[in-house]
Amino acid sequence: MLGDTMASWTGGIDFLRFCVIALNSVSPETSCRILIQPESIRKSLIALAKNGVKTLLGRRTMPLAGLPRNELIYALKSSGARIDVIDYQDTASDLADAMRRCNADVLFPCRISLGNSFPLPWVGYIPDLQHKRMPHWFSEAERRKRDDMFSKILDEAPAVVVNAAAVVQDIEEFYPNHKARLFALPFCPPAHLKKFSESYGLEVRAAYHLPARYFMVSNQFWIHKSHETAFMALRRVRDSGHDVHLVCTGKTLDYRWPEHFNDLKGIIEKNNLQEYIHILGLIPKRDQLTIMHESLAVIQPTLFEGGPGGGSVYDAISINTPSIVSDLPVNREIDIGVVRFFAAGSVDDLAAKMVDMLVTPPEMPSKEETYARLTLRQQEFGKFLLGILSMVAKGEFA
């Protein structure tokens, strides 16, 4: 597995973790090798300079690592699978050499094209086509960059994996002449019988100064996540007489819209919600899941996703927590778990669904029942992904 480009955002790390868990469920004897560049300031600066020279010369470059590699490695090893970490330098040739050193059959997922001349099998990955569906959220330069990157993947990869059937439909619409075979992964939150300690739950709640009753939004503060919809819905719910709060986790920076988080804070202040909205930022995964487990429900107000529900809904279903999710076509692909939908962008409809959740809590399946269903789904996911990787490794799509 190629770790560099997936480590640049928490959703990418979660995606790799889900894939490793699924593959391990059907082929536990198989070792997953994570290829990633060494984390070193000196080497990163040298690699950055090399990439600049290569760009001027028109030569292919490899992406630099995003988040610290330890975060990625820890997340993958927590899956329970056997993980081997393989270092490589910043060139495609060294990447190929690293694959040979560890006897890798195929490389996945590749968010940039390795080209037709790359000597070993590889599988492309496209998270979404947000720049096509929501172009106003991107600069012209970034739209061109994404177009070029995705066009190359779709022309040069033998197969490309996406997270939803909706993304396949988008690719067929915007890149109708693509050459790659497209595969939409089945919706599959990870199966685990995680036990939440009541004492640790109280400890976490005290540490973060959380109230007894709250909904949760667990997204990075990107503009398309539409936190403002949840904020205004909370205002309506409180005005209707319900004493409930909202807890938010996730990074607070949107690089495309640096002022977005300040705009959201302005909405909170304007509507006198400072006391009722708790923004915790990016917190340890264990704490995030504990807070999620203690919540009334996870709210997913997003206006765009590349996978059903986004990562927070995967986690919510996995730990048997209900969700209230915007009714985007991609989110309608959620076919497991306790989920209620609301009209995307509608403050009134979300508020109504929140009140309904307060007044009539859903009947939840047992944790054991959820685990059993997710285990079967996880094995289906693992077999499906393993089949794709095996076919590419054998050159069946060449």
Task: Name each model feature, range by range.
Residues 1-398:
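Carbohydrate transferase catalytic cores enriched for Leloir-type hexosyltransferases
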